[in-house]
């Protein structure tokens, strides 16, 4: 108990020695019998346990659990778990444990571990000479081994050199049960050809779980922790389990918010040293990772790996819902929101919701009226960088992406993807309200407003509202009188691009829209639609004032104007 208070970690209690003090460190090297858990366990009465503070009780648990793990490690075989260990793992008090609960376990011997170290050869050939050679350097030339000694637990060291040798073996008592030193001894005497095996590349130790091979038993034992949850480390905060204590330590910083690694250049702090190292490259501007295909350089190897998929066309991240594949996991995560319909990011200004935070950030620029991205060629400004990038291609005229079906070229792969749906007829975006499907997500978004009746885009000039931003843009031209779309054939100008497109048909004489009922042909689909009403007799446009119905909206407008003229003349 005094050891715990003073910060000294006892490795074991001297069992079988009358009057033995708990401070005494007795190693398995000096025992003739097999090593049991009793040899490395410490008992407390209720009074003794209550004398310890919380930190000391935690230290006791840590020492006992670590000793048990190391005992299993050194044994190299499965050891049934003592009740004390089960009690400690469950966070119960250990003072009420019976003595037999710790000692009634099958003995654990080192001999089994040592014999299994190397398949080709046991330890009996070189054990004596290595022990003498290793500890002879400490000034214990008179160290004697019992005749016929074959394993560690059969060593009989002279009592007169016990205290000095004990001091020599232990560099510090503050390190809990330094089994790595013992393992190093085992490795040295187990096979004189250990260095040769490292150079030959032989890996005689194979994991039965995953078939992975190792050249050293120590490495195999460490690897086994991945498969054995008993040796795992669990986060008390969230219950997440890790194979390594160092990984748990890093994970805990998520809960504590601790960021111990600080950049001296800009003061930014990080949870992991590796993240800080990566961050520092920003200040140096170094880009050590180069693409062999196109020569592009990156400051992170992960960025280069992702970039290479552009050349290979690899898309390892697949959506289980619709089968669509992506070259980045982040793109898949973003895509999945389409299926859930979730829109967690809401604009405080207008209430509009988005499925991505970046989209909300971009949307906010609309309210601010800010257009930070300006074209150096023509001076046109945009509120999205992607829009500026797309716009620049107008000046270069480049069209990298070609449709194999019709040969049409496009500036963007996304535009080509959308275009291909014309040939395939694919309409992946479906309205949950009415079941109507669309080939573009933007069309679905615009369509949904029909059901809500929402018109978020309002003209500041006249107050007229629209359900789509392009309609507002087209409307604004009425106030400005601007007619930017000019016909190259006759010079006539229009305020909307769609009107120019319709006008061009008059020059080429195209009459693609034909009505089978009367064989009459039209250059525009809208004109054909109006013509059909003549044959059906349908009059969908009603005048509320007179109760009259018309087959064309223009006739209704004319009727309304006529009514207002008559009213003004009266």
Curated annotation (Swiss-Prot):
It is found in: Nucleus. GO terms for molecular function: DNA-binding transcription factor activity, RNA polymerase II-specific; RNA polymerase II cis-regulatory region sequence-specific DNA binding; zinc ion binding. PROSITE patterns: KRAB, ZINC_FINGER_C2H2_1, ZINC_FINGER_C2H2_2. The keyword Ion transport does not apply. The modification N-acetylmethionine is found at residue 1. Residues 35-107 form the KRAB domain. A zinc finger (C2H2-type) spans 205-227, 233-255, 261-283, 289-311, 317-339, 345-367, 373-395, 401-423, 429-451, 457-479, 485-507, 513-535. InterPro entries: KRAB, KRAB_dom_sf, Znf_C2H2_sf, Znf_C2H2_type. Keywords: Acetylation, DNA-binding, Metal-binding, Nucleus, Repeat, Transcription, Transcription regulation, Zinc, Zinc-finger. One of its GO terms (cellular component) is nucleus. GO terms for biological process: regulation of DNA-templated transcription; substantia nigra development. Belongs to the krueppel C2H2-type zinc-finger protein family. May be involved in transcriptional regulation. This is Zinc finger protein 430. The gene is ZNF430.
